[in-house]
From Swiss-Prot:
Cysteine pairs bridged by disulfides in the record: none
Active site per database record: E353 (proton donor), H384, K504
Main location: cytoplasm
Name of the protein: Glucose-6-phosphate isomerase
Function: Catalyzes the reversible isomerization of glucose-6-phosphate to fructose-6-phosphate.
Family designation: Belongs to the GPI family.
Length: 543
């Protein structure tokens, strides 16, 4: 296969970059009055304005030519057909099947998986309705008032993001908490004010062996039994999202209350699988299906829309443009909606675990930059924190602004103030303020350099009518498919995560060295050995 940087389409982009890299957005807008209306796209309730990027129509044409040369369309079709595109694990990648409508046909190894998906969704809905209605009671007969999801990675980040994003639509009679960190403080604080007799734990681990999750699950079991006293209580206060029936039963959970999913669902793509059980309980099945419908609408748009009108494709190609030609290393996710406060953290896993790779699908080292670093904070908080660097720092960051026209909680003029700030920040980043403009305002000449804004800092804006379950589904799917687009261009596998394995293996070796009663024989590097000895000394253990 041709190396990416040797492709004529890549070299054409390099030539084009050198021709336009110093052109200011002020000039691009001045020379093209229709730019703001033309460089937009819309699908699944999302309006995507990408006019404030350092591109021309020719840039987009060349990026699409690169996508076509890299067989992006064929790769998209292969994913939707259920081919084993996760080559390193020999798995299909079919999170899109999780939100397919009941009558759809999506095959894996010749079998339609959609009926299985809906069978699990139906079981989830029945259980969620039991909990929400009070028909599911705890061991003492009290109804469940508290839901605690125990998971980590994709078993936590998706559910907690979805719950926080859609909290407005949730049943406020239920308290929903999340425990992920193996740090005991996470569990202690999550359960401090809960009544065990009214608490249901959802233990989310496909294998039911994940270290952090099962450590927290065993602690939760002991916490519940300390109050309830009878081993039989476990079956009324714990359910599992897993495929390991033997371990689930050994824990004391009734396997009738085990909700499974499939090896063609990656953890960071699993929030619409049984991993979303806590979301369904909080929102109710009807709202959860609205979430699925939003995902599916964007899935179909990605699958069928021409690349020049395809939101995820354009978004992904713009990321390639900045990562590989401008050398930008970070993307700031800036949601102007406080309900999306966990969205940047969710995207960190989705993007960085997917595309944080340094070898191609064939195992050859890449000779170009791959995954970007994602971070962010809701507006307007970030404006009083890190926006200074975005506006006047020496580093370029790509910014994604996300906003909604209608507030969920209309209070006075709060929402107009919020959205005015979002539009203003994108405008200020793009166009800045010249020294001449600063001086014309009466600024002293000595102060003018400090109050000048270079501008020419790129951003995207995503705008929707309001934050709904369907809108959230479309938004998440847009980023999922943008990640896929980037991975296809870079010729890497966005669906494995071998990078998490080495640290886990080393930790398994260090645990007994920290806990042993006698001084352990240490054979690490001198720094790690010294840190272990210092830790043992501080814990009062022989070192």
């Amino acid at each position: 296969m041709t190396v990416l940087t040797h492709r004529p389409e890549w070299r054409a982009l390099e030539t084009h970059y050198h021709a336009i890299c110093n052109v200011h957005l002020r000039q691009l807008f001045a020379e093209d009055p229709g730019r703001g209306e033309r460089l937009t796209a819309e699908a699944a309730g999302l309006f995507f304005d990408y006019a404030k990027n350092r591109i021309t129509d020719e840039t987009l044409r060349l990026l699409i030519a690169l996508a076509e040369a890299c067989d992006l369309r064929a790769r998209i079709d292969a994913m939707f057909r259920g081919e084993r595109i996760n080559a390193t694990e020999n798995r299909a990648v079919l999170h899109v099947a999780l939100r397919a409508p009941r009558g759809a046909v999506i095959l894996v190894d010749g079998a339609n998986v959609v009926p299985e998906v809906h069978a699990v969704l139906d079981r989830m809905a029945a259980f969620a309705e039991q909990v929400r209605s009070g028909r599911w009671t705890g061991f003492t007969g009290k109804p469940i008032r508290n839901i605690v999801n125990i998971g980590i990675g994709g078993s936590d980040l998706g559910p907690v993001m979805a719950y926080e994003a859609l909290r407005y639509y949730s049943d406020r009679n239920l308290t929903v908490r999340f425990v992920s960190n193996v740090d005991g403080s996470d569990f202690a604080e999550a359960t401090r004010d809960l009544d065990p007799a009214e608490t249901l734990f959802i233990v989310a681990s496909k294998t039911f062996t994940t270290l952090e999750t099962m450590t927290n699950a065993r602690t939760a079991r002991a916490w519940a039994l300390a109050a309830l006293g009878d081993e039989a209580a476990v079956a009324r206060h714990f359910v599992a999202v897993s495929t390991n029936a033997a371990e689930v039963a050994k824990f004391g959970i009734d396997t009738a209350n085990m909700f499974g999913f499939w090896d063609w669902v990656g953890g960071r793509y699993s929030m619409t699988s049984a991993i979303g059980l806590s979301t369904m309980i909080a929102l109710g099945p009807e709202r959860f299906h609205e979430l699925l419908a939003g995902f599916h609408a964007m899935d179909e748009h990605f699958r069928t829309a021409p690349f020049d009108r395809n939101l995820p494709v354009i978004h992904g190609l713009l990321t390639i443009w900045y990562a590989n030609f401008f050398g930008i290393e970070t993307v700031a996710i800036l949601p102007y909606d406080n309900y999306l406060k966990r969205f940047p953290a969710y995207l960190q896993q989705l993007t960085m675990e997917s595309n944080g790779k340094s070898v191609t699908l064939s195992g050859a080292p890449v000779s170009y930059q791959t995954g970007m670093i994602y971070w962010g904070e809701p507006g307007t908080n970030g404006q009083h924190s890190f926006y200074q660097l975005l506006h006047q720092g020496t580093r370029l960051a790509l910014c994604d602004f996300i906003g909604f026209a209608e507030p969920l909680n209309p209070l006075g003029n709060h929402h107009d103030l919020l959205m005015a700030n979002m539009f203003a920040q994108a405008e200020a980043l793009a166009f800045g303020k010249t020294t001449e403009e600063t001086l014309a305002e009466g600024t002293p000449e000595w102060l003018a350099p400090h109050r000048t804004f270079a501008g020419n800092r790129p951003s995207n804006t995503l705008l929707a009518e309001r934050l709904t379950p369907a809108t959230l589904g479309a938004l998440v799917a847009l980023y999922e498919h943008s990640v896929f687009t980037q991975g296809a261009i870079w010729d890497i596998n966005p669906f494995d995560q071998w990078g998490v394995e080495l640290g886990k293996a080393l930790a398994g070796r260090i645990v007994p060295e920290l806990m042993s009663e006698s001084a352990p024989h240490l054979a690490h590097d001198s720094s790690t050995n010294a840190l272990i000895r210092r830790y043992r000394t501080l814990r009062g253990r022989v070192s």
